Amino acid sequence: MATRIDYYESLEVSRTASQDELKKAFRKQAMRYHPDRNPGDDAAEQKFKEINEAYDVLKDEQKRAAYDRYGHDAFEGGMGGMGGGFGGGFAGAGGLGDIFDQMFGDMMGGRRDGGRRTGADVQVQVEITLMEAFTGVTKDVEVRTRVTCEACHGSGSADPKAGSSTCPTCHGAGKVRAQQGFFLVERPCPTCHGSGRTVANPCKVCHGTGTEAKTETISIDIPAGVEDGTRIRMAGKGEAGGEGVQPGDLYVHISVLSHDIFQRDGANIYCRVPLRMTQAALGTEVEVPVVDGGRSKVRIPAGTQTGETFRLRGKGFSVLRSSARGDMYIQVSVETPSHLTKRQRELLEEFEKEAGDDHAKGSPENSGFFAKVRDFFEGR
């Protein structure tokens, strides 16, 4: 069986693309792969056919709604009731893919909770700063989704009195079954597209689906302590499913931006603090910023080396669903000056002359190094 293309991937657009975005993408791809521009190129010709097929479906709101919910199955005929319209083996069907659709079909609309039909789930990604992740934040996000049709109030019918009737093909189940080899496979009903209802006089706005495409602004409450990659589920905020069908869910994927000063590791925060070599040698007290916006003083003892770390308890990141906080770790980096005044050079030369070989004894790292050198020459 030939691999079926994803219409959105074929046009290189997102699943929430507007009609204008679809049109622009189609024109761009059509110009690129048009046979007149690629004479004798079979691959380009095949691609041109694919993008035309994709745009033909996605430019029609009714076809797009069916495709978003059921994929290519929405346009396959020959699916009658139990056992009807199928050949032997897996011919004319989605094969094992249909079985996996039943298991994992929630993300594209389907059934949950023991058979309850739902609209398609919607996925969005939201970027927040490290500070917003620390305090928590409410974000307003524009979501391209399908909502209950305002014209027919979700009935799908142009005549409110007539309404809809039980689908004669699936008898209201929204799906049909067929025996395929050893498997009993369920697929969306081709007559009602899974709604279980049919409309004699379809609404002119939604064409009988009971839903229409719309861009909505949704407020998302992001709690303090969320980590990069956190997924938040907002029940019932996904796509509407038409008459008698519960809406899907909205899944918000959180992306936490990196920070110029702080690096986060779970509930702990790390901050690199540069010191002059004189500060590290003599000892000092430095003020460092903390993630809640304040400052804390840190005592640096004399003789501090690059890489040494000092901990500030309770000054780290907020913990999700808790009032606790992690710790903050100050990582010291001793910097050597690259530009010296004449006086500074004189002082350092004087220091070096005064220190002499004793310098090695005063530095743990150097003393270890010179001890190893001495042992090497003495044959130890």
From Swiss-Prot:
<feature type="binding site">
    <location>
        <position position="167"/>
    </location>
    <ligand>
        <name>Zn(2+) 2</name>
    </ligand>
</feature>
<feature type="zinc finger region" description="CR-type">
    <location>
        <begin position="136"/>
        <end position="215"/>
    </location>
</feature>
<feature type="repeat" description="CXXCXGXG motif">
    <location>
        <begin position="203"/>
        <end position="210"/>
    </location>
</feature>
<keyword id="KW-0346">Stress response</keyword>
<dbReference type="Pfam" id="PF00226">
    <property type="entry name" value="DnaJ"/>
</dbReference>
<dbReference type="InterPro" id="IPR018253">
    <property type="entry name" value="DnaJ_domain_CS"/>
</dbReference>
<dbReference type="GO" id="GO:0051082">
    <property type="term" value="F:unfolded protein binding"/>
</dbReference>
<dbReference type="InterPro" id="IPR012724">
    <property type="entry name" value="DnaJ"/>
</dbReference>
<keyword id="KW-0479">Metal-binding</keyword>
<keyword id="KW-0143">Chaperone</keyword>
<keyword id="KW-0862">Zinc</keyword>
<dbReference type="Pfam" id="PF01556">
    <property type="entry name" value="DnaJ_C"/>
</dbReference>
<dbReference type="InterPro" id="IPR001623">
    <property type="entry name" value="DnaJ_domain"/>
</dbReference>
<keyword id="KW-0677">Repeat</keyword>
<feature type="binding site">
    <location>
        <position position="152"/>
    </location>
    <ligand>
        <name>Zn(2+) 1</name>
    </ligand>
</feature>
<comment type="function">
    <text>Participates actively in the response to hyperosmotic and heat shock by preventing the aggregation of stress-denatured proteins and by disaggregating proteins, also in an autonomous, DnaK-independent fashion. Unfolded proteins bind initially to DnaJ; upon interaction with the DnaJ-bound protein, DnaK hydrolyzes its bound ATP, resulting in the formation of a stable complex. GrpE releases ADP from DnaK; ATP binding to DnaK triggers the release of the substrate protein, thus completing the reaction cycle.</text>
</comment>
<dbReference type="GO" id="GO:0042026">
    <property type="term" value="P:protein refolding"/>
</dbReference>
<keyword id="KW-0235">DNA replication</keyword>
<dbReference type="InterPro" id="IPR002939">
    <property type="entry name" value="DnaJ_C"/>
</dbReference>
<dbReference type="GO" id="GO:0009408">
    <property type="term" value="P:response to heat"/>
</dbReference>
<dbReference type="GO" id="GO:0005737">
    <property type="term" value="C:cytoplasm"/>
</dbReference>
<feature type="binding site">
    <location>
        <position position="149"/>
    </location>
    <ligand>
        <name>Zn(2+) 1</name>
    </ligand>
</feature>
<dbReference type="GO" id="GO:0006260">
    <property type="term" value="P:DNA replication"/>
</dbReference>
<dbReference type="InterPro" id="IPR001305">
    <property type="entry name" value="HSP_DnaJ_Cys-rich_dom"/>
</dbReference>
<dbReference type="GO" id="GO:0051085">
    <property type="term" value="P:chaperone cofactor-dependent protein refolding"/>
</dbReference>
<feature type="binding site">
    <location>
        <position position="189"/>
    </location>
    <ligand>
        <name>Zn(2+) 2</name>
    </ligand>
</feature>
<protein>
    <recommendedName>
        <fullName>Chaperone protein DnaJ</fullName>
    </recommendedName>
</protein>
<dbReference type="InterPro" id="IPR008971">
    <property type="entry name" value="HSP40/DnaJ_pept-bd"/>
</dbReference>
<feature type="binding site">
    <location>
        <position position="192"/>
    </location>
    <ligand>
        <name>Zn(2+) 2</name>
    </ligand>
</feature>
<feature type="binding site">
    <location>
        <position position="203"/>
    </location>
    <ligand>
        <name>Zn(2+) 1</name>
    </ligand>
</feature>
<feature type="binding site">
    <location>
        <position position="170"/>
    </location>
    <ligand>
        <name>Zn(2+) 2</name>
    </ligand>
</feature>
<comment type="subunit">
    <text>Homodimer.</text>
</comment>
<dbReference type="GO" id="GO:0031072">
    <property type="term" value="F:heat shock protein binding"/>
</dbReference>
<dbReference type="GO" id="GO:0005524">
    <property type="term" value="F:ATP binding"/>
</dbReference>
<feature type="repeat" description="CXXCXGXG motif">
    <location>
        <begin position="189"/>
        <end position="196"/>
    </location>
</feature>
<feature type="repeat" description="CXXCXGXG motif">
    <location>
        <begin position="149"/>
        <end position="156"/>
    </location>
</feature>
<dbReference type="GO" id="GO:0008270">
    <property type="term" value="F:zinc ion binding"/>
</dbReference>
<feature type="domain" description="J">
    <location>
        <begin position="6"/>
        <end position="71"/>
    </location>
</feature>
<feature type="repeat" description="CXXCXGXG motif">
    <location>
        <begin position="167"/>
        <end position="174"/>
    </location>
</feature>
<dbReference type="InterPro" id="IPR036410">
    <property type="entry name" value="HSP_DnaJ_Cys-rich_dom_sf"/>
</dbReference>
<keyword id="KW-0863">Zinc-finger</keyword>
<dbReference type="Pfam" id="PF00684">
    <property type="entry name" value="DnaJ_CXXCXGXG"/>
</dbReference>
